[in-house]
Amino acid sequence: MRILIEDVNILIDDKIVENKNILIENDIIKQISDSKSFERIDYIIDGKNKIALPGLVNTHTHLAMTLFRGFADDLPLEEWLEEKIWPQEAKLTADDVYWGSLLGICEMIRGGTIAFSDMYFFMDEMAKAVAESGIKASLSVGMIGIAGDENETLNRGVSFAKNWHNAEDGRIRVMLGPHAPYTCPPSFLEKVIDKAIEMSLGIHTHLSETYLEVENIKNMYGLTPIRLMDRVGLFNVPVLAAHCVFVDDEEIEILSEKGVGVAHNPQSNLKLASGVAPVKKMLEKGVKVGLGTDGPASNNNLDMWEEIRLVATLHKGVERDPICVPARDALIMATKNGMEILGFENSGIIKEGYKADLILVDVNKPHFYPRHNLVSHLVYSASSSDVDTVIVDGRILMEKRELKTLDEEKIMYEAEKRAFELIKKS
């Protein structure tokens, strides 16, 4: 399949390159040029008044929690989890996770998200939803190491990895998913690390999300979560660490030296009053930071444009520094950094020879005028509804705001029905 995107503006680094033509051959960006003279074009997309940029990457979410959107709001994390969310999650079925995942994927594709990282359960059903939709994902079975048989818990994660890692021509990747230090003691984590090394897998976990978590771990082990993880050897494998809100300067050095990828979830952290991660210091020390929404029950959406704008504004206010997290850095966090953290190679930028993972944003709208700085407009003015076209591995998932791979009406109906059936269950 050879697709030509004509007369499109392209985001390359921190600049908009105007009026180019992008030739996509199968799943690769074959050529970017001024010419339209190509042999055998199967499909043409009009790029006029649009910006092509890398697809957005949600580095941390719990997709099937779309079913709990709006169910429990305005509560602290511990109460929200223990009294509201966990009792409902205990009722979930595999079908619930499948339809909840599809609902989230519809929302993400509509907003220009082309890849995400998720930790949950019934992950075979989520993987099926990913396979059907055409989106990319790094998936992890959430593992709790303090309840039941530790070996059985670990084996579920390992079995899932064997079945799905690099499936769908590499669109689906798998990490092992020990939930957090407060649910996974060092003895269990050591087993997870050994398996990750044996299978050449990364690890996805939650770290230092709240002040209470940090204090509890210090009381239990005499170390902060990040120092504890460093001691047990977690950072000897590629790690995606979600949150990292309460970290000190020495811990930031550890994250940098060990190459830990951090999923910054600014909106969820604010909504749950968890705090604000020291992103400025992380970036200064070379920590690779991506952006995430967290679950749609704690955000309450999967809109990466909101996270992009928030990361570029929140830290300016917190640091009292107007140049902290400039527009260019916010976009890199949401694209290139995210793909690298998830382990997808040759993606995250628009370049010849790279994967055709890109979106087209319609900038022929009042909030993009006057066009003094379109890079700035993408961060401070754009929204999900501006995304016109989504292409993943050279496959069109959405064009002119129409989803091509999913039955959106059916998915919304099924998800709504299941969400309210869950609430009715005793």
Curated annotation (Swiss-Prot):
It catalyses: S-adenosyl-L-homocysteine + H2O + H(+) = S-inosyl-L-homocysteine + NH4(+); S-methyl-5'-thioadenosine + H2O + H(+) = S-methyl-5'-thioinosine + NH4(+). Its EC number is 3.5.4.28, 3.5.4.31. Signal peptide: none annotated. Zn(2+) binds at H60, H62, H206, D294. InterPro entries: Amidohydro-rel, Deaminase_MtaD/DadD, Metal-dep_hydrolase_composite, Metal_Hydrolase, MTA/SAH_deaminase. Its cofactor is Zn(2+). It holds the Pfam family Amidohydro_1. GO terms for molecular function: 5'-methylthioadenosine deaminase activity; metal ion binding; S-adenosylhomocysteine deaminase activity. Substrate binds at E89, H179, E209, D294. Keywords: Hydrolase, Metal-binding, Zinc. The keyword Zinc applies. Binds 1 zinc ion per subunit. It is an enzyme of class 3 (hydrolase). Catalyzes the deamination of 5-methylthioadenosine and S-adenosyl-L-homocysteine into 5-methylthioinosine and S-inosyl-L-homocysteine, respectively. Is also able to deaminate adenosine. Belongs to the metallo-dependent hydrolases superfamily. MTA/SAH deaminase family. HAMAP family: MTA_SAH_deamin. This is 5-methylthioadenosine/S-adenosylhomocysteine deaminase. It comes from Dictyoglomus thermophilum (strain ATCC 35947 / DSM 3960 / H-6-12).
